[in-house]
């Protein structure tokens, strides 16, 4: 199936969030599906989801649990380009970091669905030699990968469930800074990225996912389904090249 052509013309129907104030700069028009999205760097944030050793490094939780992360290196490079462009444009960069306390109290016990469905917890129960290794705060698995170290001005928001908005400071952090638009990257497309993006939609944020700056757990069909969900029901879908050309054309 061919990819629909991107329309880059800003019209009265282009979602643009809050009305433009007198004297405010014109928004950047990000080519996207199903229609272009008008964004200001000043009221937008780049959300980098769970770029941790657990999800993107060999020997981390996801690799140890049997998921294919061979495509993660390409995703890492694309996210790094996106972060550089966002910083050039003066856009807020927010890193989400998934995990629990070393005693796993935050993970929930048998009374929590998370205890039963988390593949990290299930893998550790099945392989006792791995107990305490996965997603424990302070451990290597929990750390952000070397290519994604936050810089001054970036924000790191810890989270304990798939959605970055659940029981976290993410919503208040964004609203305090007047953020209305969110640009999503990270791992895994169909789990924490999509969960957080769906909650963003419910909280009245305009959300766009850069499809080539995300990586799924489960195969190409899963990625395709998640992209379909986002562009059809919850937000917009664009690419790293289009984002960089829109916000940091000198580096494109």
From Swiss-Prot:
Polar residues bias locations: 1-14
EC identifiers of the protein: 3.5.1.110
Gene3D superfamilies reported for this sequence: Isochorismatase-like
Biological processes per GO annotation: nitrogen utilization; uracil catabolic process
SUPFAM superfamilies linked to this entry: Isochorismatase-like hydrolases (SSF52499)
Residue ranges of coiled coil: none
Enzyme class: hydrolase
Protein name from the UniProt record: Ureidoacrylate amidohydrolase RutB
High-level lineage: Bacteria, Pseudomonadati, Pseudomonadota, Betaproteobacteria, Burkholderiales
Gene designation per UniProt: rutB
């Amino acid at each position: 199936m061919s990819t629909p052509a991107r329309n880059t013309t800003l019209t009265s129907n282009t979602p643009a969030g809050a009305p433009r104030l007198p004297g405010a700069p014109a928004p950047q028009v990000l080519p996207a599906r199903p229609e272009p999205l008008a964004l200001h760097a000043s009221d937008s944030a780049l959300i980098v989801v769970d770029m941790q050793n657990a999800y993107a490094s060999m020997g981390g939780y996801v690799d140890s649990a049997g998921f294919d992360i061979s495509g993660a290196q390409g995703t890492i490079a694309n996210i790094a380009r996106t972060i550089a462009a966002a910083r050039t444009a003066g856009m807020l960069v927010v890193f989400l970091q998934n995990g629990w306390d070393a005693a796993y109290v935050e993970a929930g016990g048998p009374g929590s669905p998370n205890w039963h469905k988390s593949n990290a917890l299930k893998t550790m129960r099945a392989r006792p030699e791995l107990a305490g290794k996965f997603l424990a705060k302070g451990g290597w698995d929990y750390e952000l990968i070397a290519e994604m170290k936050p810089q001054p001005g970036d924000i790191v928001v810890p989270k304990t469930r798939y959605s970055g908005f659940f029981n976290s400071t993410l919503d208040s952090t964004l609203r305090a800074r007047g953020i209305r638009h969110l640009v999503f990257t990270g791992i895994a497309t169909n789990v924490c990225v999509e969960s957080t993006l769906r909650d963003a939609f419910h909280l009245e944020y305009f959300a766009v996912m850069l499809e080539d700056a995300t990586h799924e757990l489960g195969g190409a069909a899963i990625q395709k389904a998640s992209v379909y969900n986002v562009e059809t029901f919850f937000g917009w879908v664009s690419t790293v090249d289009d984002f960089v050309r829109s916000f940091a054309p000198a580096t494109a």
